[in-house]
């Protein structure tokens, strides 16, 4: 008699910080014979990305309420109830053995639907402070996991699943051993770029002329404007692009990173073993600040919050990072990483089925 094939439904959507870790766990369990489906929304990145990975996806209609008007707020209970009913139909039709909530608005109705159908819920919080949806779902979840300490008081710290290509990078001492010349600084503001980085870094390049060489991801639609800023500062030799397809290659090239502090970015920088200057996005719960705090406490990174992110301040920090300092910081970053995060999450998913 053959063992029953186990079924996982991943609930994640909206941003790469939710979707890519979910894909990592999905592929890991699929390699062990699991069947995997996805619960998402039809108008966000998961709608196209997940099927490209050979995973079927079901959709519910749900969106966030932050920043919406009074009418949207008043209609919210109806829309949440409708999404919950849609998710329950999907759960009953496919009958997963366990669901994994990796974040995004879809996780709320999806998690409630699974719980109401008697399906165990495993919850993974990617950020250093838990959002409203996950704080609610934690109360009904079989297991709660967190990437960084402090999001939940008693949850296991398992890290964030990151791409295999990043985990495969050589150790910092091997990458940095023979490097000379200008310090290589990678500037990334996420796939959409970050205006504060685009406005500040061309002048930093001029202030530290000859000391730095930059690879700057500016985000969609900002290329012409940022190229003009570099030209106005007499710094046209730097590599300026809208989007970087191969982040592992970019991390391998870099000596240091200047970036936002999204959960997946922080985890990838630690896994790669790179010093970082973090500029957290100004969110009311300071989510990105708490993501970056662990690496700053490990003396592997520096945080400059956006109101203080000036040409002078950034230049002073980067000018103080010589090659021996960068190597020490890189080694501390990699020591703070959790490289087996994918396996840890997958084990907890499997354990929830057996419990």
Curated annotation (Swiss-Prot):
It catalyses: di-trans,octa-cis-undecaprenyl diphospho-N-acetyl-alpha-D-muramoyl-L-alanyl-D-glutamyl-meso-2,6-diaminopimeloyl-D-alanyl-D-alanine + UDP-N-acetyl-alpha-D-glucosamine = di-trans,octa-cis-undecaprenyl diphospho-[N-acetyl-alpha-D-glucosaminyl-(1->4)]-N-acetyl-alpha-D-muramoyl-L-alanyl-D-glutamyl-meso-2,6-diaminopimeloyl-D-alanyl-D-alanine + UDP + H(+). It comes from the Bacteria. InterPro entries: GlcNAc_MurG (IPR006009), Glyco_trans_28_C (IPR007235), GlycoTrans_28_N (IPR004276). UDP-N-acetyl-alpha-D-glucosamine binds at residues 15-17, 127, 163, 191, 244, 263-268, 288. SUPFAM superfamilies: UDP-Glycosyltransferase/glycogen phosphorylase. Coiled coil: none annotated. It is found in: Cell inner membrane. It is a peripheral membrane protein. GO terms for biological process: carbohydrate metabolic process; cell division; cell wall organization; lipid glycosylation; peptidoglycan biosynthetic process; regulation of cell shape. HAMAP family: MurG. This is UDP-N-acetylglucosamine--N-acetylmuramyl-(pentapeptide) pyrophosphoryl-undecaprenol N-acetylglucosamine transferase. It comes from Sodalis glossinidius (strain morsitans). The gene is murG.
């Amino acid at each position: 008699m053959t063992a029953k094939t186990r079924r996982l439904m991943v609930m994640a959507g909206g941003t790469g910080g939710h979707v890519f870790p979910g894909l990592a766990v999905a592929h890991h369990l699929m390699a062990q014979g699991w069947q995997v489906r996805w619960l998402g929304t039809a108008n966000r990145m998961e709608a196209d990305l997940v099927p490209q990975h050979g995973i079927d996806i079901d959709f519910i209609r749900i969106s966030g309420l932050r920043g919406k008007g009074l009418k949207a707020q008043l209609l919210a209970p109806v829309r949440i109830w409708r999404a919950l009913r849609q998710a329950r139909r999907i759960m009953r039709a496919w009958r997963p053995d366990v669901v994994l909530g990796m974040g995004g608005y879809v996780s709320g109705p999806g998690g409630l639907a699974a719980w109401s159908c008697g399906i165990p819920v495993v919850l993974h919080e990617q950020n250093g402070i838990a959002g409203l949806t996950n704080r609610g779902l934690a109360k009904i979840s079989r297991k709660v996991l967190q990437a960084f300490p402090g999001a939940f008081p008693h949850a296991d710290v398992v890290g964030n699943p990151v791409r295999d290509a990043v985990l495969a990078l050589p150790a910092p001492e091997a990458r940095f051993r023979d490097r000379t010349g200008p310090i290589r600084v990678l500037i990334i503001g996420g796939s959409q770029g970050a205006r504060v980085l685009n406005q500040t870094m061309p002048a930093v390049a001029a202030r530290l002329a000859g000391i730095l060489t930059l690879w700057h991801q500016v985000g969609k639609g900002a290329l012409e404007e940022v190229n003009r800023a570099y030209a106005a500062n007499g710094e046209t030799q730097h590599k300026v692009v809208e989007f970087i397809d191969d982040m592992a290659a970019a991390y391998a090239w870099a000596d240091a990173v200047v970036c936002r502090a999204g959960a997946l970015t922080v985890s990838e920088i630690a896994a790669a073993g790179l010093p970082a200057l973090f500029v957290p996005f100004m969110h009311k719960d300071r989510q990105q600040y708490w993501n970056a705090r662990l690496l700053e406490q490990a003396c592997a990174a520096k945080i400059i919050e956006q109101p203080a992110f000036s040409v002078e301040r950034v230049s002073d920090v980067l000018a103080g990072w010589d090659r021996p300092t960068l190597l020490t910081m890189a080694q501390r970053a990699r020591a703070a990483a959790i490289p087996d995060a994918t396996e840890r999450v997958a084990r907890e998913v499997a354990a929830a089925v057996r419990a």
